[in-house]
Amino acid sequence: MSASNLLPMISSNPAQFAQASLAKAFAPRVAQGQQSVLSFEAMLSTNMLDRIGPLASREDLLPPDAESTLEDLQKDPLALLPPHMRAAIESMDQTPQSAVAIDDHYVAPAPIQSSRITWNGGSLTKPELQIVAVLNRHKDLCPLSWESLEAKVNDPSTPPDLKAAIEALLQDPELFYAIGSQGDGRCGGKITAKDLSEFSKHHPQVAAFQESQAQSYAQNYIPSDSAENAQPSVMTENDALRELYRYSEYLPKNLSLADFKQIVDGEAKTGKCPPQVIAAAQYFVSHPEEWKRLYGGNIDKVHKEDFLEVASSSMSLTQAELDTLKTINSHQELFFGSGDLTRDKLASMADDKSLDPKVREAASQLLSDPLLFGLLNNAITGYKTHHGFFDFGGGHTVDSGNVSKEDFGRFYTNMTTANRTVQQPKFHVPETEAAQNAVADMKMGLADQPDIKSPKKNGGASCMSSTPCCG
C-alpha cells in the first residue's frame, strides 16, 4: 500500500487502521452494530419468506415464470425493495462504517500498551508497516508527542504523506506505544528519531517492507527537483549522486554500503529522507561496484564530506543548470558587480522586471536549485571543515551562502566532462500497482524539499586544491 493511499483509506475506512486496542474500547458497540444489521437482514428475510411461502405452495396460482422469480427472491430478499432503500440497507452491512461511524474521530487519551505488538516483538499489519515507513522518512520532525499529533495534522506545513500517516497513527495508540517504549517497554508519550530507528531494527518486518518499497522506488524514480507532472524512469548512478548531494545535510556522518542499507531499512540516523533518497541508497546497495569505483575501487566507508567532494565532479548537470551557468558567465557584472551573490540578491534580481528575461530566469533557477548553488558556493573551499589533526583557528566557511566571482570562475572553468554531459532519461508508464504506488510516493517526496544548508566554520586552512573535486 502506498503512503498516498493512506489518506483516502482513513477518510473512508477509519476502522481498518484501528488495531486491537481500539477494538477493546469499541467491542460492545461493534458487536451491537453488527448484531443490528444481522438482525435487520434476518427479520427482512424471514418476513419475505413468510409472504413467499404460501404462494410457493399454490403452484396453480403462479404465472409460468414466477417459480424462478421466487427462487431468486429467496436467495436475495432485498430485491423487492426500491433501489435507494436497498443501497441504504446494503451500506449498513459494511463493517467499518456501521461499527465505528459514531466514533469516527475518536482518539485515545494516551498511547495504549498491548501484548499484540511491543517495542521488540509482535507482528505489524500492512497499514502499520506503511505508517512506520512514512515516519522513518520524516525523522527530522521528531520528537512527536501523542498530544501534538492532531496539531501536526492541522499544520499546513506538514508533508502530505506524514499527515496521512499521523492520522492513521491516531487511530492506532498501540503502535505509538510500541514505537515509543524502546529499551524498557515503557512509553513516555512521545516518539523520537532514535525510537524509530530502534523499532525498525527490532522488527524485521519493517526492513522487508521498506526494502521492497526501495526497489520499486529505484525502478520508478522521479527527481526531487522535477515538476509535478514528471514521468518515472529507472534510477542511474548520476541520479543517486544528485539526490544524496541535495539531501546531504540529513545523511549520517559516514557513508558506506552498510549505511545505505540502514537508510533503506529505516535504521539509520537520518533527517529528511524522502523516497528519492531511499531510492539513491538502494541504488548503491544494488550496485556496490559503482559505489566503490567512486573512490578508486577498494574503499567502501567514507566521510560524508569526502563523498561530496567526489560527487561534485562526478555528477551531470541538467540543461537548465548549464543554461544558468552560461547566462551568469555572460552577465558577470550584473551578478557580481555589487559583491557576492546571495540568495536575497538572487530573489531581488528574479523580481526585477528591468532586467533581461534571461538574467531573471537564471537568477530564479539558481535560487531554487540548492545543488547548483552548493557547487558554486563551495568551489574553492571544498566541503571539509577540518583538513588535519592540528588545524585550528582561521579557515573558511562551508556552505556560507555567499558565492563570489572567484567561486563561480573556479567551478565554471574546471567543470568536468561529467558535469557538462546532460543525461537523457528513458521514461516509462507505471503499469503495476507497485509501480503506481512508487510513483505516488515519489510525487509525495516533491513536497519535502531540503532546507537551506547551515554554514559550517572550518577550524583551519581552507582547501587550496584547484581540482573540481574540491569544489
Curated annotation (Swiss-Prot):
Induction cue: By flavonoid signal compounds.
A Pfam entry, by short name: NolX
Region named Disordered: 448-471
Keyword Coiled coil: no
Keywords: Nodulation, Plasmid
Keyword DNA-binding among record annotations: no
InterPro entries reported in the protein's UniProt record: NolX
Role: Regulates cultivar-specific nodulation of soybean.
Name used for this protein in its record: Nodulation protein NolX
Organism: Rhizobium fredii (Sinorhizobium fredii)
